[in-house]
């Protein structure tokens, strides 16, 4: 079983690709009502994005509740460039036999503009090649630690992550323009259930996971985050992969 948590689809796509290549099943943890039984699994995998150089809280909480059978355990984190100590920290919650980081298209539109179409296609093509190798290593139960931690990994995974969780998860800067048609896509897609509709317009709870699905997947590009996101490209992986690879 391969468990995943995803925002704009990068980690979902990676999990599904690995499931296909290894003959396994990919499962979105946000759809699970109960902690699954993995005692009979031959392999247990985790795929998730890097949030401020750590695994998302929702994924670490989920993993900490899972049983730890004799299955081969692996983790893949998707990131824009560096992973910091993400996998080492995650392995404290669920010990891993193999750990990987995989560069995928940028989606943190709050911090910087998303990648161009050309860069997106290049990153996805590189990821496809890397996933072939990762799948073979998993199938052969090879113990691998191929994580690009980057510079000052410890500082980033401690101080930057602390700052992110303390200050950056606020939803106050979110707002919608008059392009909003009240479709509710943002509310349906929010894994934290932090968005609800009031008078046909989205409203946010005080904090969220900063998964960026709402702002990137809004069909009318009506959602903004302060002034920083106006005019920036939106990104979801579905627009850049074949139909058969989409959710």
Feature-to-residue mapping (PLM):
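FMN-binding flavodoxin-like domain, especially the glycine-rich phosphate-binding loop
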Residues: 2, 6-13, 17-48, 52-167, ...
């Amino acid at each position: 079983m391969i468990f995943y948590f995803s925002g704009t689809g990068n980690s979902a796509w990676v999990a599904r690709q690995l499931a296909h290549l290894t003959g396994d099943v990919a499962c979105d943890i946000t759809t699970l009502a109960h902690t699954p039984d993995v005692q009979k699994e031959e392999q247990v995998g985790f795929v998730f994005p890097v949030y401020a150089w750590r695994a998302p809280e929702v994924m670490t909480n989920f993993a900490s509740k899972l049983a730890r059978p004799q299955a081969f355990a692996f983790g893949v984190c998707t990131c824009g460039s560096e992973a910091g100590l993400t996998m080492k920290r995650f392995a404290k919650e669920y010990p891993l036999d193999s750990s990987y980081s995989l560069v995928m298209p940028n989606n943190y539109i709050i911090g910087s503009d998303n990648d161009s179409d050309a860069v997106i296609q290049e990153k996805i093509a590189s990821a496809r090649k890397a996933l072939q190798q990762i799948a073979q290593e998993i199938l052969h139960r090879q113990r691998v630690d191929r994580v690009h931690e980057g510079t000052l990994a410890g500082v980033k995974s401690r101080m930057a992550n602390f700052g992110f969780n303390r200050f950056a998860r606020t939803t106050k800067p979110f707002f919608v323009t008059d392009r909003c048609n009240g479709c509710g896509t943002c509310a349906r897609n929010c894994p934290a259930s932090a968005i609800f509709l009031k008078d046909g317009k989205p409203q946010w709870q005080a904090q969220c996971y900063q998964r960026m699905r709402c702002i990137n997947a809004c069909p009318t590009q009506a959602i903004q985050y302060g002034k920083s996101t106006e005019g920036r490209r939106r990104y979801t992986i579905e627009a850049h992969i074949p139909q058969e690879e989409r959710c």
